[in-house]
A protein has these predicted regions:
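Cys/His-clustered metal-coordination modules, chiefly Zn-binding fingers
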Residues: 170-289
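Context-gated lysine
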Residues: 4, 35-38, 97, 118, ...
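Short N-terminal helix-initiation segments at or just after the protein's N-terminus
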Residues: 130-132, 154-162, 195-202, 289-291, ...
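Charged, low-complexity interaction segments
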Residues: 1-79, 256, 260, 264-305
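N-terminal alpha-helical interaction blocks
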Residues: 18-176
């Protein structure tokens, strides 16, 4: 069973400054480079190590394409203003419809992924998704945006998710981060997506502050500690971790909504990555299955957990 960690003191006030920046939009090349490097560090011959090595290859392909794709269009000021006026995400994922630009991106990414070492089942899934017609691709995108993926097609959906991450990270990078604002509980201020995990950062002037990380576009947004990352409740918040673990990876549980979201402490380990380490800490998810809490975060490479 996970080890429960008691909460003590006023942890909502932790941080070097009282007002941390609300949001940080991603630098796509650095985002995927860091993710790939961390996946490589976590990979190995045993357990899920080979799978993590495969995911490193996906992140490397995503990074490589960031410098090869045409530059994304600048943010439409009228559309941005309308979204901000109504507390809506400027890159509303629920309104996204695959267009010719996205289909070109998927073709190039899937082509690059042909060169990534992978087991036969993963290769078969890639071949299948490359043959998918426009209607099938549109349906897969819609399911991913709804966080609803058929169990029997998880591998195919993971490839489409990788393309969506690349598309949305590039789009989010063009947003004016200082103008972003909260859009709802457990929602990214850039695209409206759910968090993949949260971080206690060690940044200058914000050290000790907590940020949620978007599973889709990679935007980070400030979220005070001892507060549920899904429903924003401050009641019944507890922490659980693997016994005798490093103390840097914990599951934050909420009695109000019954969810848990992982929290990584970069102050103690700067190599932690909100996306890669979410997959790398699968053991914590397996232990949390023995509790009454369900996973509240979304990770397309952990579908089924």
């Amino acid at each position: 069973m996970p080890r429960k960690v008691p909460v003590s003191g006023d942890m909502t006030a932790i941080g070097e400054v009282r007002t941390a920046p609300f949001a940080r939009v991603p630098d796509p090349e650095r985002l995927f480079e860091r993710r790939a490097r961390r996946f490589h560090q976590l990979s190995g011959p045993d357990g899920i190590g080979p799978y993590l090595g495969f995911l490193a290859g996906i992140a490397e392909a995503q990074q490589a394409l960031t410098g090869q794709l045409p530059e994304t269009d600048a943010t439409d000021e009228a559309r941005l203003g309308l979204a901000l006026d109504h507390a809506m995400p400027p890159l509303d994922r629920n309104a996204f419809k695959p267009d010719a630009e996205f289909r070109s991106l998927t073709d190039r990414l899937f082509g690059a992924l042909q060169e990534v070492a992978k087991p036969p089942a993963a290769q078969n899934a890639l071949s299948a998704v490359r043959k998918a017609d426009d209607a099938s691709l549109d349906a897969m995108v819609a399911d991913l945006m709804a966080d609803s993926v058929p169990v029997g097609a998880m591998a195919e959906f993971a490839y489409v998710a990788a393309a969506l991450q690349l598309h949305f990270a590039r789009a989010a990078s063009r947003l004016p981060e200082r103008r972003l604002q909260p859009v709802g509980d457990g929602a990214c201020p850039a695209c409206g997506g759910p968090p993949v995990s949260s971080l206690i950062v060690g940044w200058p002037h914000a050290s000790g502050s907590r940020f949620c990380s978007c599973a889709l576009c990679g935007t980070l947004w400030h979220h005070v500690r001892i507060k549920c990352a899904i429903c924003s409740s401050t009641k019944g918040i507890r922490y659980q971790e693997i016994e005798d673990g490093p103390g840097t990876i914990k599951a934050e549980t909420c009695d109000e909504c019954g969810c848990y979201v992982k929290i990584f402490n970069q102050q103690k380990d700067s190599s932690l990555d909100p996306f890669a380490d979410d997959v790398g800490s699968l053991g914590l998810d397996l232990l949390m299955r023995e509790t009454s809490f369900r996973r509240g975060a979304f990770n397309p490479f952990l579908l089924g957990y």
